[in-house]
Amino acid sequence: MSSGGLLLLLGLLTLWEVLTPVSSKDRPKFCELPADIGPCEDFTGAFHYSPREHECIEFIYGGCEGNANNFNTLEGCESACAA
């Protein structure tokens, strides 16, 4: 294979690595936790990653405690957990 072909192959492999979504084995364990409303009653919208749905979804959060699978924004959830 010519050096140009090798360079093209290397570029394509690099692009594939960058564009490949996070796999479930690379996803943090807290993303597998269920949505947890917590014990408080300051109800507000939040997002959690749903392993069953394979996406971040909105839920009502009580405002305190809960667990680590709890994000203020959809973007934050997707950045941490979405595949």
Curated annotation (Swiss-Prot):
GO CC terms of this entry: extracellular region
SMART domains: KU
Family label: Belongs to the venom Kunitz-type family.
Family annotation (Gene3D superfamilies): Pancreatic trypsin inhibitor Kunitz domain
Keywords: Disulfide bond, Protease inhibitor, Secreted, Serine protease inhibitor, Signal
Signal sequence segment: 1-24
Primary subcellular site in the record, as a coarse category: secreted
Flavoprotein found in the keyword field: no
Name recorded for this polypeptide: Kunitz-type serine protease inhibitor microlepidin-4
GO MF, any single term: serine-type endopeptidase inhibitor activity
Subcellular location: Secreted
Disulfide topology: C31-C81, C40-C64, C56-C77
Organism: Oxyuranus microlepidotus (Inland taipan)
PANTHER family noted in UniProt: KUNITZ-TYPE PROTEASE INHIBITOR-RELATED
Annotated BPTI/Kunitz inhibitor domain residues: 31-81
Role played: Serine protease inhibitor.
Tissues showing expression: Expressed by the venom gland.
Lineage top rank: taxon: Eukaryota
